[in-house]
Amino acid sequence: MGGRLPFNQSFWEEFLMGREGSLPNLPEISHVSKRVVRILGGNPGSMHLQGTNTYLVGTGRSRILIDTAQGLPAWIHRISSFLFTHNIELSYVLLTHWHGDHTGGVPDLIAHNPLLTNKIYKNNPDAGQNTITDGQIFSVNGATVRAVFTPGHSVDHMCFVLEEENALFTGDNVLGHGFSVAQDLGCYMDSLRNMSALACGLGYPAHGAIIENLPGKLDEYIQHREGRERMMLSTLTKELVQGQERRGEGTKGGLTLNEIVISIYGRLPQEVIEKALAPSLLQVLWKLTEDRRVGFKPGDPLKRQWFALISVE
């Protein structure tokens, strides 16, 4: 074993959930409902699961396309062939957010059909694109799609309600397997709750299999994030109490991120802490700071000390 640090099994089960192993195979093209066709982006991997899901929505010749994958030749070949074979034209191309695995296919799509240049929609549009606003409606035969602003995973993230199916295109906010990541955890939690309030039964995620029980999946996501907050706040509160016992009342104490990780997960390789855990745990700490439940001492984010401002039961 040498000087190697032991791996924490519970951490790896969480971190690798839905990543590369034991994922169900998804067809390259599939009719997932009578009005929704899923076309995979051809970009499978640890961050993209089976690849980016792009969706053709509608029942007539005119359809809505949601997302354009990463820009790999496999995707433009699949979708262009499908459009030609089924005599379909695109009325709207809706982008859930700016990340490259969702917008990368736009140039290929326009190169294939220059008439689509003015049919690209995004919340924070690039030059020549159209904006998407909260509540905006996009309609074609057989499909009414309503945009819902859901920031957090990214600043411009949109979900889309398919009214005819009471279904939600969840983008990257909720995945078919495992958990997503957030740029702004506070906004992300608000968006998850707003998505839950829509009461859609079915989820069409941007990565992974269809979510048959979307309310249950949203509850799982919310509880997972809230559980992490409670766990970290409890760890810091315990340190606060023990620090006051050791050094007297009024002592803030505090733990570095490494010390928090060791307390919660046990000892892990430093590379794992910095590359896998630190980004998400720092987001939790920042949210707790914004909620005025945690404070910190100035310094490097990985080395500064964090301390509880209030106690928990």
From Swiss-Prot:
Record keyword Zinc present: yes
Keywords, sorted A to Z: Hydrolase, Metal-binding, Zinc
GO BP of this protein: secondary metabolite biosynthetic process
The record's free-text note on cofactor binding: Binds 2 Zn(2+) ions per subunit.
Entry-linked Pfam families: Lactamase_B
Cofactor list: Zn(2+)
EC number assigned by the record: 3.1.-.-
Binding locations of Zn(2+) 1: H97, H99
Class of enzymatic activity (EC top level): hydrolase
Pathway in which this enzyme or protein is active: Secondary metabolite biosynthesis
SMART domains: Lactamase_B
Superkingdom as given in the UniProt entry: Eukaryota
GO MF: hydrolase activity; metal ion binding
InterPro entries on file: LACTB2-like_MBL-fold (IPR047921), Metallo-B-lactamas (IPR001279), RibonucZ/Hydroxyglut_hydro (IPR036866), Sec-metab_biosynth-thioest (IPR050662), WH-like_DNA-bd_sf (IPR036388)
Annotated catalytic residues: D101 (proton donor/acceptor)
SUPFAM superfamilies found in the cross-reference section: Metallo-hydrolase/oxidoreductase
Record-listed Zn(2+) 2 binding positions: D101, H102
UniProt similarity note: Belongs to the metallo-beta-lactamase superfamily.
Protein task: Lactamase-like protein; part of the gene cluster that mediates the biosynthesis of neosartoricin B, a prenylated anthracenone that probably exhibits T-cell antiproliferative activity, suggestive of a physiological role as an immunosuppressive agent. The non-reducing polyketide synthase nscA probably synthesizes and cyclizes the decaketide backbone. The hydrolase nscB then mediates the product release through hydrolysis followed by spontaneous decarboxylation. The prenyltransferase nscD catalyzes the addition of the dimethylallyl group to the aromatic C5.
Protein known as: Lactamase-like protein nscB
The organism of origin for this protein: Arthroderma gypseum (strain ATCC MYA-4604 / CBS 118893)
